[in-house]
Amino acid sequence: GSGDNAGFFGIDSIELKCVLSAENSKKIYLNKEIEESWTEEDIELFHKLSFEERVFNADYLSTEFEITKFLVDFAKTNKAVLAGLEYRVKSPKSLYNKLYQRVEKSFFDSIADVIRYTVILEPKEYVEQIRSVTDALYEKNWKIYSLKNYWVNDSFPYNGVNAKFKNSRNYRIEIQFHTQESFDVKMSEEDHKLYEQRRVLEPGCDEYNRILQLQLKLYSDMEYPENIADLEKI
């Protein structure tokens, strides 16, 4: 039924749970549904973030409610599918790793994929519906600042459109638009195995190029969205 998703993701009535900060007992409000998906390690690492980072993260997560609700409603009325919605928010563990374990620390507010959605569209409506989503988000003050159309790049083994948006508070979200076929290939074991093999090779060597061609073939053997080259004009 139409209400199934909404209940499962707890977004019809978002519940913000109050978490006290150890340092100065200021209150942080967290989206309860997201927090409940965290492991013990996630909770531990969340508390290892600085207070500012925790507040920023919690605040960020309370803004994603509006986008999630909009995309769920959009999917219901437009034959679209939201894939892996429960994974839309980067966990504290991967966030902590990105901030503290890498050689180059990322600035917290420049992490574009703390909140990431995957939207699967029909090839015939694909371009039109991406425009509908970006227009509607623009109305909600989410402006697009990066649009990558991989369908028109024959040398890169991936098909899809990756769009990044930010609002006036510099919060960022990413939406990946797929067709069912491009999503299935991206998630396939075959593509993953080839990627893992290629990743450790020297770019340009014979074996690297051979594996790359196999990956490119996976992506070229599918129906391409109508008028996909026109998408640059967003």
Per-region residue spans from a language model:
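Non-Sec secretion/translocation targeting segments of pathogen effectors
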Residues: G1-F9, V119, I175
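Charge-rich, low-complexity segments
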Residues: G3-I111, V127, R131, E189, ...
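Long beta-strand-rich cores associated with HINT superfamily self-processing modules
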Residues: Y100-I234
